[in-house]
């Protein structure tokens, strides 16, 4: 986590660099923060068209192993997805969070995969969030997300907040 001011200067961070360190990319208070460019194979999920989403899925599944987990594919293909969000997209599509690429392709669920992907990320484009804290039945917090999480069913208690800063 990196906190920056309006000019992208680092105010604080969860882990700052040492000035004398030999890190290629130093993270120090007062320095301008420049995020790393996205790897070429990972693209932003925001503003993604259905055609692009489906073409990328097909290209990946044509070259890989059909048993490859769909959530892992989403993590490798799109920047900014968390493992929780990737599993949630797959869960909303297939009813399980560990479905394979082949399972989704064989069951004709690719369009539904896109619709669930879009259902999570279209609100983000409009700065609409559903901050959600997930607790185990004993009250222990184990997940936090910007959107509703359904994959845990009755094994989790969801606590919704009005804003991300609550």
Language model features: what each stretch is:
Residues 1-166:
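Extended, highly charged segments
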């Amino acid at each position: 986590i990196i906190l920056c001011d309006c000019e992208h200067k680092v105010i604080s961070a969860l882990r700052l660099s040492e000035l004398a360190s030999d890190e290629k990319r130093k993270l120090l208070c007062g320095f301008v923060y420049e995020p790393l460019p996205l790897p070429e194979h990972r693209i932003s999920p925001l503003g993604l068209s259905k055609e692009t989403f489906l073409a990328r899925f097909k290209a990946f599944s044509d070259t890989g192993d059909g048993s490859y987990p769909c959530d892992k594919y989403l993590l490798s293909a799109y920047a900014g997805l968390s493992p929780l969000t990737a599993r949630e997209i797959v869960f909303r599509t297939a009813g399980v969070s560990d479905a394979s690429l082949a399972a989704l392709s064989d069951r004709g669920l690719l369009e539904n995969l896109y619709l669930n992907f879009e259902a999570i990320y279209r609100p983000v484009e409009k700065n609409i969030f559903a901050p959600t804290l997930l607790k185990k039945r004993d009250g222990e917090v184990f997940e936090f997300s910007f959107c509703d999480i359904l994959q845990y069913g009755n094994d989790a208690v969801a606590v919704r907040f009005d804003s991300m800063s609550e």
